């Protein structure tokens, strides 16, 4: 820590608050450098945290955390917060097995008020926390930090609408890094922020409300005048004022002096407050400033050269999907690709560039994405919703009410299904088979490799009903891609014929299943379809084998193995059944290989489980 003389002294925000304001720019400089060095050595989210260094320092300097409660939305930007709150020396373990969590996590630190991972939850939770504090007369302050992407979600506006109606004391900070700081985010805005948050103005504002409450015409005139003063700098503020917030900003989110001055003033204000700050994602590191998307989440890399390592030569499943989408769009103008703000992650960059009229990024709005797709289907188009398994959970009612009940031809391309890895509990794709399987009209497919994935996407697209194809995070296995053809619905493939034991595989654990079967002389069936399931095959296997083993990367409860159990029960088979899958707890972070080994779903673990069962 010799390169970080001030930062090495900071083991908690209390230490930070002992520094003079004149020392804070140096702390920001050291914090940014330390963040870059640690993430480049461990992997993780980089660009967002680089952009929130000054804000993080200012918040912990002004607010008495953890007594005052600071809530980070999503948590990508919370790495500086972790460094300042006693976890500096553990940053090298972030996102690793048994290491510190990639997002704020309640079990990890008293400074992490809310466990997060999905976006747009901070204001709702913050309002609940603020109401609880107000009822207890605790005297603590509540601050929510939310990004310009997360605030587009309906949940954020629902919470602000409620907060405005309750007039609860809380502060929402919008970290706006969508554009670089323009000239109007300078002296005039900073001066106006000081004016509008100052005690003189706020006392006149609140006192004037009481005096003028019985004089509506004058009250309305004063309100309009105030709005025009604020709107002179930021017309967007009027929208938040209409929700019942006192809007301040935008101000420079990298000016530590102005941030502290504004926050000190706002801490004393009553009612819901909204501070709009402008930051630059990747601030202070030229490669990340130039490519904030590429440096959003990074593997280990050389931060001196700024070069990210090249990926595996085998394409990812996301790229397989993106290539399939382009191939289909070349011949079908009715295809519409939809993503809820995950263009890069879902492999849709090329599609969005080549077919912009057939591409929609609906922002962080999963519910809207699904019902928007339903509307397109009603209008005669063929929508494909590309969505991570963990985010599809957020649109469950829309899948049922707006797609399945009407039996509309919407294809769900479910990325990151199964064990995802380093992002931990909030991002594992553990539940989609279970929550989709119980929905009438839904077809569910589980490809075992990239060619199967393409064929299943094609099959689902050609069906005149809802369909889902789930595929994992990571690289495919390198099989040959064959021309697209429709698959027979609900039909499985015999991969290996053995005796006594039959492994019924659902998904990309097939190579592992084959290796286990070689040792046990077991039959292997690639089931392919969870729904409709191959009842005939299950019946035949049950008659000729002593033990059926189901294998899936989904929770055991309600999963594909449960579907097999239901078939066996309905046909009154007495064949033994061993269901292997994800257990009944939230799966923590680690590499995919580490997690599968811990869950006994690697080759050795599966073999041991079968032998123990016998």
From Swiss-Prot:
Self-association and partners: Homodimer.
A GO term for molecular function: 1-deoxy-D-xylulose-5-phosphate synthase activity
EC number: 2.2.1.7
S-S bridge residues: none
EC primary class: transferase
InterPro entries per record: Dxylulose-5-P_synthase, THDP-binding, Transketo_C/PFOR_II, Transketolase-like_Pyr-bd, Transketolase_BS, Transketolase_C, Transketolase_CS
Keyword Iron assigned: no
Protein name per UniProt: 1-deoxy-D-xylulose-5-phosphate synthase
Family: Belongs to the transketolase family. DXPS subfamily.
